[in-house]
Amino acid sequence: MNEAKAKKLTLVLHNTIINMYKIERRKTRTVKIGKIKIGSGHPVAVQSMVKVRAQNVAKSVEEIRKLEIAGCDIVRIAVEDEKDARALKDIKKRINIPLVADIHFDHRLALLAAEAGVDKIRLNPGNIYRVHEVRAVIAAAKNARIPIRIGANSGSLRIRSRDAAGALVASVVDYLKIFKKARFKDIVISLKGSDITDTITAYEKMASLCGYPLHVGMTATGLPLDGIVKSSVGIGILLFRGIGDTIRISLLDEPRQEVAVAKFLLNSLGLRNFGPELICCPACGRCEVDLLKKAQRFQEWLDKLPGAQSSKLKNLRIALMGCVVNGPGEAREADLGIAFSRHKGVLFKKGRICGTVSL
Protein backbone atom coordinates (compact mmCIF):
# COMPACT_ATOMS: atom_id res chain seq x y z
CA MET A 1 0.00 0.00 0.00
CA ASN A 2 1.48 3.36 -1.02
CA GLU A 3 1.60 6.39 1.27
CA ALA A 4 -1.35 8.17 -0.40
CA LYS A 5 -3.64 5.15 0.02
CA ALA A 6 -2.49 4.70 3.61
CA LYS A 7 -3.34 8.32 4.43
CA LYS A 8 -6.75 7.99 2.76
CA LEU A 9 -7.53 4.79 4.69
CA THR A 10 -6.42 6.43 7.94
CA LEU A 11 -8.75 9.37 7.29
CA VAL A 12 -11.68 7.06 6.52
CA LEU A 13 -11.07 5.07 9.72
CA HIS A 14 -10.77 8.28 11.76
CA ASN A 15 -14.06 9.66 10.42
CA THR A 16 -15.79 6.32 10.96
CA ILE A 17 -14.70 6.20 14.61
CA ILE A 18 -15.73 9.83 15.17
CA ASN A 19 -19.18 9.14 13.72
CA MET A 20 -19.55 5.96 15.80
CA TYR A 21 -19.07 7.88 19.02
CA LYS A 22 -20.68 11.17 18.04
CA ILE A 23 -23.47 12.06 20.45
CA GLU A 24 -26.85 12.10 18.73
CA ARG A 25 -29.23 14.08 20.88
CA ARG A 26 -32.78 12.90 21.40
CA LYS A 27 -35.31 14.80 19.28
CA THR A 28 -37.54 17.09 21.35
CA ARG A 29 -39.85 20.05 21.17
CA THR A 30 -38.32 23.50 21.48
CA VAL A 31 -39.26 25.38 24.64
CA LYS A 32 -38.40 29.04 25.17
CA ILE A 33 -37.27 30.16 28.64
CA GLY A 34 -36.86 33.91 28.46
CA LYS A 35 -34.32 34.53 25.73
CA ILE A 36 -32.98 30.96 25.90
CA LYS A 37 -34.35 28.21 23.67
CA ILE A 38 -33.90 24.63 24.83
CA GLY A 39 -34.45 21.29 23.10
CA SER A 40 -32.61 19.11 20.62
CA GLY A 41 -32.16 21.95 18.15
CA HIS A 42 -30.33 24.11 20.68
CA PRO A 43 -27.22 23.87 22.90
CA VAL A 44 -27.54 22.10 26.24
CA ALA A 45 -28.16 24.91 28.74
CA VAL A 46 -26.36 25.27 32.09
CA GLN A 47 -28.56 25.96 35.09
CA SER A 48 -27.85 26.75 38.74
CA MET A 49 -29.84 27.84 41.79
CA VAL A 50 -29.66 30.80 44.15
CA LYS A 51 -28.88 29.75 47.73
CA VAL A 52 -30.49 32.68 49.56
CA ARG A 53 -34.13 33.70 50.06
CA ALA A 54 -35.72 35.61 47.20
CA GLN A 55 -36.95 38.25 49.64
CA ASN A 56 -33.30 39.19 50.16
CA VAL A 57 -33.25 40.95 46.82
CA ALA A 58 -29.75 42.44 47.07
CA LYS A 59 -28.12 39.10 47.96
CA SER A 60 -30.13 37.24 45.32
CA VAL A 61 -29.13 39.70 42.60
CA GLU A 62 -25.50 39.57 43.74
CA GLU A 63 -25.44 35.77 43.46
CA ILE A 64 -27.16 35.79 40.08
CA ARG A 65 -24.76 38.37 38.65
CA LYS A 66 -21.85 36.18 39.73
CA LEU A 67 -23.53 33.26 37.97
CA GLU A 68 -23.94 35.36 34.82
CA ILE A 69 -20.21 36.09 34.81
CA ALA A 70 -19.48 32.39 35.37
CA GLY A 71 -21.48 31.50 32.26
CA CYS A 72 -24.78 30.30 33.71
CA ASP A 73 -27.64 30.23 31.18
CA ILE A 74 -30.67 29.86 33.48
CA VAL A 75 -31.10 30.46 37.22
CA ARG A 76 -33.70 29.05 39.61
CA ILE A 77 -34.77 30.59 42.90
CA ALA A 78 -36.80 29.16 45.78
CA VAL A 79 -40.13 30.83 46.51
CA GLU A 80 -41.16 29.90 50.05
CA ASP A 81 -43.83 32.47 50.83
CA GLU A 82 -45.64 35.53 49.53
CA LYS A 83 -42.78 37.85 50.49
CA ASP A 84 -40.43 35.81 48.30
CA ALA A 85 -42.96 35.87 45.45
CA ARG A 86 -43.37 39.64 45.67
CA ALA A 87 -39.58 40.08 45.46
CA LEU A 88 -39.30 38.29 42.11
CA LYS A 89 -40.30 41.35 40.09
CA ASP A 90 -37.43 43.43 41.52
CA ILE A 91 -34.94 40.60 41.02
CA LYS A 92 -36.05 40.07 37.43
CA LYS A 93 -35.48 43.74 36.58
CA ARG A 94 -31.85 43.59 37.72
CA ILE A 95 -30.59 40.40 36.05
CA ASN A 96 -29.84 39.33 32.49
CA ILE A 97 -30.53 35.58 32.46
CA PRO A 98 -33.88 33.75 32.62
CA LEU A 99 -35.36 33.38 36.11
CA VAL A 100 -37.19 30.22 37.19
CA ALA A 101 -39.48 30.22 40.24
CA ASP A 102 -39.16 27.03 42.29
CA ILE A 103 -42.58 26.32 43.82
CA HIS A 104 -43.57 23.70 46.39
CA PHE A 105 -46.74 23.06 48.45
CA ASP A 106 -48.62 26.30 47.70
CA HIS A 107 -49.80 26.75 44.10
CA ARG A 108 -50.77 30.37 44.82
CA LEU A 109 -47.08 31.25 44.90
CA ALA A 110 -46.82 30.08 41.30
CA LEU A 111 -49.64 32.43 40.35
CA LEU A 112 -47.80 35.33 41.98
CA ALA A 113 -44.54 34.31 40.30
CA ALA A 114 -46.16 34.30 36.87
CA GLU A 115 -47.61 37.73 37.59
CA ALA A 116 -44.15 38.95 38.66
CA GLY A 117 -42.71 38.12 35.24
CA VAL A 118 -40.57 35.04 35.83
CA ASP A 119 -39.49 33.08 32.76
CA LYS A 120 -40.50 29.61 33.94
CA ILE A 121 -42.26 27.91 36.84
CA ARG A 122 -41.13 24.66 38.42
CA LEU A 123 -43.85 22.55 40.05
CA ASN A 124 -43.27 19.44 42.15
CA PRO A 125 -45.94 16.79 41.46
CA GLY A 126 -45.22 15.34 44.89
CA ASN A 127 -46.61 18.33 46.80
CA ILE A 128 -48.76 20.30 44.34
CA TYR A 129 -51.10 17.68 42.94
CA ARG A 130 -54.72 18.78 43.33
CA VAL A 131 -56.13 19.03 39.82
CA HIS A 132 -57.82 22.41 40.26
CA GLU A 133 -54.58 23.90 41.66
CA VAL A 134 -52.46 22.59 38.79
CA ARG A 135 -55.03 23.86 36.29
CA ALA A 136 -54.86 27.32 37.87
CA VAL A 137 -51.07 27.38 37.45
CA ILE A 138 -51.36 26.20 33.84
CA ALA A 139 -53.84 29.01 33.13
CA ALA A 140 -51.46 31.57 34.66
CA ALA A 141 -48.54 30.20 32.62
CA LYS A 142 -50.60 30.35 29.44
CA ASN A 143 -51.52 33.94 30.16
CA ALA A 144 -47.89 34.87 30.87
CA ARG A 145 -46.64 32.76 27.93
CA ILE A 146 -44.10 30.92 30.05
CA PRO A 147 -43.26 27.21 30.34
CA ILE A 148 -43.64 24.92 33.32
CA ARG A 149 -41.14 22.34 34.51
CA ILE A 150 -42.63 19.23 36.02
CA GLY A 151 -39.89 18.48 38.53
CA ALA A 152 -40.24 15.11 40.26
CA ASN A 153 -37.83 14.26 43.10
CA SER A 154 -37.37 10.83 44.66
CA GLY A 155 -37.48 12.39 48.13
CA SER A 156 -40.94 13.92 47.71
CA LEU A 157 -42.92 11.28 45.84
CA ARG A 158 -46.49 10.84 47.06
CA ILE A 159 -46.39 7.08 46.61
CA ARG A 160 -43.30 5.25 47.86
CA SER A 161 -42.03 2.22 45.98
CA ARG A 162 -38.99 -0.03 45.91
CA ASP A 163 -38.90 0.78 42.21
CA ALA A 164 -37.77 4.39 42.62
CA ALA A 165 -37.21 4.93 38.90
CA GLY A 166 -40.65 3.58 38.05
CA ALA A 167 -42.25 5.73 40.74
CA LEU A 168 -40.60 8.88 39.37
CA VAL A 169 -41.82 8.14 35.85
CA ALA A 170 -45.33 7.23 37.03
CA SER A 171 -45.56 10.48 38.99
CA VAL A 172 -44.71 12.56 35.91
CA VAL A 173 -46.88 10.55 33.52
CA ASP A 174 -49.88 10.97 35.81
CA TYR A 175 -49.20 14.72 36.14
CA LEU A 176 -48.93 15.11 32.37
CA LYS A 177 -52.56 14.03 31.99
CA ILE A 178 -53.66 17.33 33.55
CA PHE A 179 -51.49 19.28 31.12
CA LYS A 180 -52.76 17.29 28.14
CA LYS A 181 -56.38 18.03 29.03
CA ALA A 182 -55.47 21.72 29.31
CA ARG A 183 -53.68 21.55 25.93
CA PHE A 184 -50.51 22.94 27.44
CA LYS A 185 -47.29 21.86 25.71
CA ASP A 186 -44.60 24.28 26.90
CA ILE A 187 -43.27 21.68 29.30
CA VAL A 188 -39.86 20.66 30.63
CA ILE A 189 -39.48 17.50 32.71
CA SER A 190 -37.02 16.37 35.37
CA LEU A 191 -36.88 13.13 37.38
CA LYS A 192 -34.13 13.52 39.96
CA GLY A 193 -32.99 10.90 42.43
CA SER A 194 -30.03 10.55 44.76
CA ASP A 195 -29.16 7.13 43.32
CA ILE A 196 -27.31 7.21 39.99
CA THR A 197 -28.82 4.02 38.58
CA ASP A 198 -32.39 4.98 39.50
CA THR A 199 -31.95 8.44 38.00
CA ILE A 200 -30.52 7.15 34.72
CA THR A 201 -33.25 4.52 34.44
CA ALA A 202 -36.00 7.08 35.10
CA TYR A 203 -34.70 9.53 32.49
CA GLU A 204 -34.23 6.82 29.87
CA LYS A 205 -37.79 5.59 30.39
CA MET A 206 -39.22 9.11 30.28
CA ALA A 207 -37.21 9.90 27.13
CA SER A 208 -38.90 6.96 25.40
CA LEU A 209 -42.38 8.14 26.41
CA CYS A 210 -42.42 11.80 25.39
CA GLY A 211 -40.84 14.46 23.24
CA TYR A 212 -40.54 17.16 25.88
CA PRO A 213 -37.11 18.62 26.76
CA LEU A 214 -35.52 17.10 29.85
CA HIS A 215 -33.73 18.98 32.61
CA VAL A 216 -31.13 16.51 33.87
CA GLY A 217 -29.56 16.37 37.31
CA MET A 218 -29.09 14.48 40.54
CA THR A 219 -30.51 15.47 43.92
CA ALA A 220 -28.98 15.20 47.43
CA THR A 221 -25.50 14.34 46.18
CA GLY A 222 -23.48 14.78 49.40
CA LEU A 223 -20.31 16.77 50.05
CA PRO A 224 -18.80 18.76 47.16
CA LEU A 225 -16.42 16.07 45.87
CA ASP A 226 -19.11 13.38 46.14
CA GLY A 227 -21.54 15.68 44.36
CA ILE A 228 -19.15 16.38 41.51
CA VAL A 229 -18.48 12.67 40.96
CA LYS A 230 -22.10 11.51 41.26
CA SER A 231 -23.47 14.30 39.09
CA SER A 232 -20.76 13.93 36.46
CA VAL A 233 -21.30 10.17 36.21
CA GLY A 234 -25.10 10.29 36.17
CA ILE A 235 -25.50 13.34 33.96
CA GLY A 236 -22.53 12.38 31.78
CA ILE A 237 -23.98 8.95 30.96
CA LEU A 238 -27.33 10.47 30.04
CA LEU A 239 -25.76 13.19 27.91
CA PHE A 240 -23.60 10.62 26.12
CA ARG A 241 -26.81 8.75 25.28
CA GLY A 242 -28.31 11.93 23.87
CA ILE A 243 -30.61 12.63 26.81
CA GLY A 244 -30.64 16.10 28.37
CA ASP A 245 -31.47 19.61 27.24
CA THR A 246 -30.59 21.55 30.38
CA ILE A 247 -28.38 20.39 33.25
CA ARG A 248 -27.63 21.35 36.83
CA ILE A 249 -24.72 20.02 38.88
CA SER A 250 -26.24 20.14 42.39
CA LEU A 251 -23.48 20.86 44.90
CA LEU A 252 -23.21 21.83 48.54
CA ASP A 253 -20.91 24.63 47.40
CA GLU A 254 -20.83 28.04 45.76
CA PRO A 255 -23.36 28.20 42.89
CA ARG A 256 -20.54 29.30 40.59
CA GLN A 257 -18.84 25.96 41.22
CA GLU A 258 -21.93 24.20 39.88
CA VAL A 259 -21.59 26.19 36.67
CA ALA A 260 -17.85 25.51 36.38
CA VAL A 261 -18.36 21.73 36.67
CA ALA A 262 -21.29 21.79 34.22
CA LYS A 263 -19.21 23.66 31.66
CA PHE A 264 -16.29 21.23 32.03
CA LEU A 265 -18.69 18.31 31.60
CA LEU A 266 -20.31 19.69 28.46
CA ASN A 267 -16.94 20.70 27.07
CA SER A 268 -15.45 17.24 27.66
CA LEU A 269 -18.35 15.59 25.80
CA GLY A 270 -18.07 18.00 22.89
CA LEU A 271 -21.58 19.36 23.46
CA ARG A 272 -20.51 22.94 24.18
CA ASN A 273 -17.32 24.89 23.69
CA PHE A 274 -16.56 27.42 26.40
CA GLY A 275 -13.02 28.35 25.43
CA PRO A 276 -9.51 26.88 25.22
CA GLU A 277 -9.06 23.49 26.91
CA LEU A 278 -6.19 23.10 29.37
CA ILE A 279 -4.81 19.59 29.95
CA CYS A 280 -2.16 18.70 32.53
CA CYS A 281 -0.47 15.52 33.66
CA PRO A 282 -1.21 14.41 37.26
CA ALA A 283 2.48 14.86 38.21
CA CYS A 284 4.68 12.25 39.88
CA GLY A 285 8.16 11.98 41.43
CA ARG A 286 9.74 12.94 38.12
CA CYS A 287 8.06 16.36 38.14
CA GLU A 288 10.56 19.02 39.21
CA VAL A 289 8.23 22.03 39.19
CA ASP A 290 5.11 23.01 41.11
CA LEU A 291 2.84 22.03 38.23
CA LEU A 292 -0.42 22.59 40.10
CA LYS A 293 0.51 26.17 40.94
CA LYS A 294 1.64 26.86 37.37
CA ALA A 295 -1.54 25.33 35.93
CA GLN A 296 -3.78 27.31 38.28
CA ARG A 297 -2.05 30.56 37.44
CA PHE A 298 -2.22 29.78 33.73
CA GLN A 299 -5.95 28.97 33.94
CA GLU A 300 -6.60 32.24 35.78
CA TRP A 301 -4.75 34.10 33.03
CA LEU A 302 -6.63 32.17 30.36
CA ASP A 303 -10.00 32.99 31.94
CA LYS A 304 -9.21 36.71 31.77
CA LEU A 305 -7.67 36.63 28.30
CA PRO A 306 -9.51 39.02 25.94
CA GLY A 307 -10.88 37.12 22.96
CA ALA A 308 -10.64 33.69 24.60
CA GLN A 309 -14.16 32.96 23.30
CA SER A 310 -13.27 33.97 19.73
CA SER A 311 -13.45 31.35 17.00
CA LYS A 312 -9.65 31.36 16.69
CA LEU A 313 -8.94 30.66 20.36
CA LYS A 314 -11.91 28.75 21.78
CA ASN A 315 -10.98 25.50 20.01
CA LEU A 316 -7.39 25.47 21.24
CA ARG A 317 -6.07 22.55 23.30
CA ILE A 318 -3.19 23.60 25.53
CA ALA A 319 -0.97 21.16 27.44
CA LEU A 320 1.12 21.83 30.56
CA MET A 321 3.20 18.74 31.33
CA GLY A 322 5.43 18.10 34.32
CA CYS A 323 8.32 16.06 32.91
CA VAL A 324 9.98 14.75 29.77
CA VAL A 325 8.54 11.18 29.95
CA ASN A 326 5.02 11.77 28.63
CA GLY A 327 5.29 15.52 28.41
CA PRO A 328 6.66 15.96 24.90
CA GLY A 329 4.27 13.37 23.46
CA GLU A 330 1.20 14.84 25.13
CA ALA A 331 2.27 18.38 24.32
CA ARG A 332 2.73 17.41 20.68
CA GLU A 333 -0.90 16.25 20.53
CA ALA A 334 -2.09 19.67 21.72
CA ASP A 335 -2.24 22.82 19.62
CA LEU A 336 0.17 24.46 22.05
CA GLY A 337 2.13 22.88 24.87
CA ILE A 338 5.03 23.05 27.24
CA ALA A 339 6.94 20.20 28.87
CA PHE A 340 8.78 21.30 32.02
CA SER A 341 12.12 20.22 33.41
CA ARG A 342 13.81 21.76 36.45
CA HIS A 343 15.38 24.71 34.68
CA LYS A 344 13.50 25.08 31.41
CA GLY A 345 10.32 24.39 29.49
CA VAL A 346 10.20 23.03 25.96
CA LEU A 347 7.52 24.72 23.86
CA PHE A 348 5.51 22.92 21.19
CA LYS A 349 3.17 24.18 18.48
CA LYS A 350 1.16 21.74 16.41
CA GLY A 351 3.56 18.95 17.32
CA ARG A 352 6.79 20.78 16.59
CA ILE A 353 9.31 22.25 19.01
CA CYS A 354 9.21 26.00 18.61
CA GLY A 355 11.43 27.14 21.46
CA THR A 356 12.42 26.90 25.11
CA VAL A 357 11.93 29.12 28.12
CA SER A 358 14.11 29.42 31.20
CA LEU A 359 12.45 28.93 34.58
Task: Give names to the regions the model predicted.
Residues G41-K59, A78, I97-F105, R160-V169, ...:
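Active-site mouth loops of central-metabolism enzymes
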Residues I17-M49, E300:
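N-terminal amphipathic alpha-helix/helix-capping segment at the start of soluble metabolic enzymes
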Residues E68-D90, R122-R130, I187-I196:
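Glycine-rich, proline-tolerant flexible connector loops at the mouths of alpha/beta enzymes
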Residues N153, R160-P306:
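Catalytic alpha/beta core domains of metabolic enzymes, predominantly
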Residues R108-R149:
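Hydrophobic or amphipathic alpha-helical targeting/insertion segments
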Residues V44-V50, V75-I77, L99-I103, I121-L123, ...:
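Hydrophobic faces of well-ordered beta-strands that scaffold small-molecule active sites
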Residues G117-V131, M218, R241-P255, F340-I353:
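Glycine-rich phosphate-binding active-site loops on the catalytic face of alpha/beta enzymes
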Residues E82-A101, A136-I148, M206-L214, W301:
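Alpha-helix-loop-beta-strand connector modules within alpha/beta enzyme cores
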